[in-house]
């Protein structure tokens, strides 16, 4: 099923013409409304007229998460707040969240691209969809919600967590589709199996995203639940879920090219790479009103496929994310930077920042453990005081990253010191 | 009296490591106890030379600390411990932890209290003998 055949199956020449036109309009809008970009363009000696089409895209400056942080919270918005109808946020690199905004048109475009994703996965108004992404500042819940409403599916807005309720809804309300993180769906599958409820559910398809996952996980999910597992990709800075999506052929995610222009760059030289190469994925938002971004560096590694897909869509496809160019971790769908944990430890002040982060997947749920060296300065010879310290560190980290963490105190000098850039993370999830 | 307290992770061989270091530094252990939690323990020792034990263990990167404790000698007969605790409790002292041993006619008790100075004074007034 194709939601918007006119756009999704447009030939390359036409889509590039549309992109060029929208890019030029965007550059003008941004130049006059976002001082941050105007300054950047002036430094580069770039004038509005220098961008005549997508062939000039490489002349524009890059944008990073740090830029958004430096302009926290609303500094990069291109419209007055009276036109912003919603704000979302995701974790930043050091504790300050990355804030994004949407106008009414932005929300409408967002619903449109999620509707395309749902149709791509075969979900229509005949379906009931259990939306188990968190509703709130996180874009997952409300993003999926808007698209599901647009296609007219019956939404069961469960939001994240509360496994008991999730299972009850799967059994009693008989949804045919579910949207959540792949690891959470595996966890739900385990629970259904344990309670011998697998034959009581009507699920047919799952729309999964917000964290990296492998082909092996896909196979596991499809086998355990006897459903199709479809990938949806997105990031709040660009829009949220729906920036790209897999169709039922599961061979790369179709990018909504009428809204976002993708590029693949070399993360070291920052030069665009030839078609088909693997590198860092970069997006320029050409229709966004509230928060238009030039060449946003996702730090995700991928490559682009330009051939027409078997499904008939001509839109460019991105291959499954193979890694990141920074040290960001995605744990239970939440972005976590080691620097956030470091800043939590520094705020406590009693610990020297020698720590190690261990990420693991136990029973299909991501676990986060932080080992902290016990400094002599605060070593107490009473267990109760050490336990109080553990609780204090745990609370501080949870306050900053928003997900649960286990803190373990270890002896001084037992965490490996490395020369140069310290290795702070051991990820045992094999993803 | 100075007790030495050492932070030790719960893993095989760690206690062994401490005793090896102390032996190499020519230090004799007089009394010991281990307080344990799930992941780590605190080893508390009375040793022949607390200051030098502290230096030796610090050099080997252990988190160590000297703690004031009171070590009392009593007769190994029933009611001895009760008499000490009565003196402390009547004096408003709370015991944070304690350990002890008995051999032959003598028993030794080691206390960590919230107020070691007052506790020593009270015990002295009541004619208890220190180790």
Question: How would you describe each model-predicted region?
Answer:
Chain B
Residues 1-131:
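A conserved regulatory-domain signal marking ACT and ACT-like small-molecule sensing domains
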